């Protein structure tokens, strides 16, 4: 919110946060800017789960990015990604299902690529685009922890009492560049060009970032959210331990 207020004054607002903790989905703070007809950027560092290119152990984090921009189509364009090929949550799912995972996701503790999720959970994650993801993750640490005077690299989450995570928030006030309705019209034209592109064989529709999530949100609001059964049970158990009301019923539905 501070970045948004700064953007109202000068067109762009940049805030670095230190001594923080997990801030959830990076799309959430980015979308706060969209609600004010701005472009939002949010990124955070994280625990050292990603191996630098050529290394066998983790030094940088998954370091997610969220970038959100308004459109005139009823939903914002939202990119919400971690900089690793996959996260350990997905690997846990593969492990529970007894399945092998792709080789380019993670390394064993010895630095070997593996398709065994159990071995991967003990090792390090790999960056998207090989060395490119590592480079982006390192520079995310620079823009958050190093610049903000907070934790970076091996430090975040190393001390449970002080998790020392750092974030970067940027808000860009579109009205300083052009009327927001003109921006939305230009966005819609751009999206139209993307959706009109020649499709690959077997592809029914070309989507833009955030579109699947928008459709899923509409479905969940109408029909209820779908959760992995294990996660549902974990949430119910946690609520019971904390004496929190959990007014939801476990209903098995077809995938």
PLM feature spans:
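N-terminal nucleophile
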Residues: 41, 60, 64, 82, ...
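Catalytic-core signal marking the mid-to-C-terminal active-site face
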Residues: 155-255
């Amino acid at each position: 919110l501070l970045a948004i207020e700064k953007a109202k004054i000068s067109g762009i607002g940049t805030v670095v946060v230190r001594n923080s903790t997990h801030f959830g989905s990076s799309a959430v703070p980015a979308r706060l800017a969209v609600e004010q007809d701005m472009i939002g950027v949010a990124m955070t560092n994280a625990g050292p789960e990603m191996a630098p290119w050529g290394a066998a152990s983790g030094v940088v984090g998954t370091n997610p990015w969220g970038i959100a921009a308004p459109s005139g189509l009823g939903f914002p364009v939202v990119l919400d990604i971690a900089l690793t090929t996959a996260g350990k949550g997905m690997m846990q799912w593969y492990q529970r299902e007894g399945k092998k995972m792709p080789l380019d996701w993670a390394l064993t503790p010895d630095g070997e690529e593996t398709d065994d999720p159990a071995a991967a959970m003990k090792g390090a994650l790999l960056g998207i685009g090989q060395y490119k993801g590592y480079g982006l993750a390192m520079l995310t640490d620079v823009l958050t922890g190093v610049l903000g005077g907070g934790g970076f690299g091996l430090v975040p989450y190393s001390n449970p009492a002080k998790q020392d995570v750092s974030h970067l928030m940027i808000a860009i006030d579109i009205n300083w560049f052009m009327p927001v309705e003109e921006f939305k019209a230009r966005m819609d034209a751009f999206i139209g060009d993307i959706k009109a592109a020649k499709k690959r064989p077997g592809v029914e529709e070309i989507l833009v970032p955030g579109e699947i999530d928008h459709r899923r949100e509409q479905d969940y609001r109408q029909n209820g959210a779908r959760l992995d059964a294990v996660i549902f049970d974990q949430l119910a158990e946690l609520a019971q331990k904390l004496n929190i009301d959990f007014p939801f019923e476990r209903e098995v539905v077809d995938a």
